[in-house]
Structures are given as structure tokens and as C-alpha cells.
A protein has these predicted regions:
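Bacterial N-terminal signal peptides that target proteins for export
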Residues: 1-9
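Cys/His-coordinated Zn2+-binding motifs and related Cys/His-dense segments, i.e., zinc fingers/knuckles
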Residues: 2, 19-20
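Bacterial N-terminal signal peptides
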Residues: 9-16
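Mature, structured domains of secreted/extracytosolic soluble proteins
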Residues: 20-184
Length: 184
């Protein structure tokens, strides 16, 4: 009897996990599958489009944080987004002397909680054209819906397009963006 109960519990656990995995589909980013049961770092490390971001997260000592429980919403700039920065900026940020600046840039791309693309659509229906988000760095970042597409506006007034929304992770969600956003 006890053995049957254990077997039934195990089967229910497998079914529950399958239901969660089915709800949060696997998305391809940078030529790699982003599995919803893996954490933000484990998935990002597999994306060939996010090698600069991963190197920056490692240099800033933020790997353990982003492997933590979260949940986190990460607006993940691609390598091409980092390439848009003035020449030498990335190399300068990766130097130990600029660690605090690097952490500030990276934590500006992270919002506590798990915010998916449905939220701005819901806010838009409530008459909000733009919604302010409080980032981990403590600065404001704005999200807006324009022509059916999600956009970020940073503290300097620059915009970034969310090119791949809702890449679910075990500890949050990633939204791929085409521009590095900056606080004031």
C-alpha cells in the first residue's frame, strides 16, 4: 500500500512538472534553447547572442545573485546592443577599477519580480501609455506599448526594443533587448 502511494505521488509530481513546462515553452535565443526549468545564468551562458552580457555579469560578481531564487525580470541586451555603445565602453566597464559602474549598468537591466509581456498590455488597457518600473539599481525604467511592440525608455531618454519577450526561467523571465539602457 505504501509503495503504491509513493508511486502515485511520484507520478503526480511528474505530471505537475510537465504541466508547468508545457505552460512555459522553450524559446530559442542566440541559437540555443532557453529551458524554463533552468535559471537565468545557465540559459544565458548558452546564448551566442549574450556572450558580452555573460562576461559582464561574471566580471561584476553577479552570477550567484542571478542564479538565486528571484524572481527577477532581466532585460538582456544582445552583443549587438553592446556594440552600439561608444568604442571602448565595454572594455572600460570590464576593468576592475570600474566595477561599481558596471554593477550599476547591469542592475539597471533587472527588475524584482516576474514581469511578462502581458502586463504592459493590461496597463495599456487601463489607460496607461507608459509604466514606470523600479530597477534593482534603484533607478526608474519605463515600459510602453507602441504599435503592438514593447519598448523600454531609460533615464537618458533612449529607447530599446524588446525583440524577444517572455523567455521564462526557473527564477524569473528574460526579455531580449536591442539596446543597452542607462540610468541618468
Amino acid at each position: 500500500m505504501f509503495r503504491r502511494l509513493i508511486t502515485m505521488c511520484a507520478a503526480l509530481s511528474v505530471l505537475a512538472a510537465a504541466g508547468i513546462a508545457a505552460k512555459e515553452k522553450t524559446v530559442m535565443v542566440g541559437g540555443a534553447a532557453m529551458y524554463p526549468w533552468k535559471d537565468i545564468i545557465d540559459n544565458a551562458m548558452n546564448s551566442k547572442d549574450h556572450t558580452t552580457l555573460v562576461a559582464a555579469v561574471k566580471a561584476a560578481g553577479l552570477v550567484a545573485t542571478l542564479k538565486g531564487r528571484g524572481p527577477f525580470t532581466v532585460f538582456a541586451p544582445t552583443n549587438a546592443a553592446f556594440d552600439k555603445l561608444p568604442k571602448g565602453t565595454v572594455d572600460m566597464l570590464l576593468q576592475p577599477a570600474h566595477l561599481d559602474m558596471l554593477k550599476g549598468v547591469l542592475t539597471y537591466h533587472v527588475v524584482p519580480g516576474r514581469l511578462d509581456s502581458k502586463m504592459p498590455k493590461e496597463w495599456a488597457h487601463k489607460g496607461k501609455a507608459t509604466t514606470e518600473l523600479k530597477t534593482v539599481s534603484g533607478d526608474a525604467l519605463w515600459v510602453a506599448m507602441k504599435d503592438g511592440k514593447l519598448w523600454l525608455k531609460d533615464g537618458k531618454g533612449m529607447t530599446a526594443s524588446i525583440t524577444i519577450p517572455d523567455v521564462y526561467q526557473s527564477n524569473g523571465v528574460i526579455h531580449v533587448i536591442d539596446t543597452v539602457v542607462m540610468a541618468k
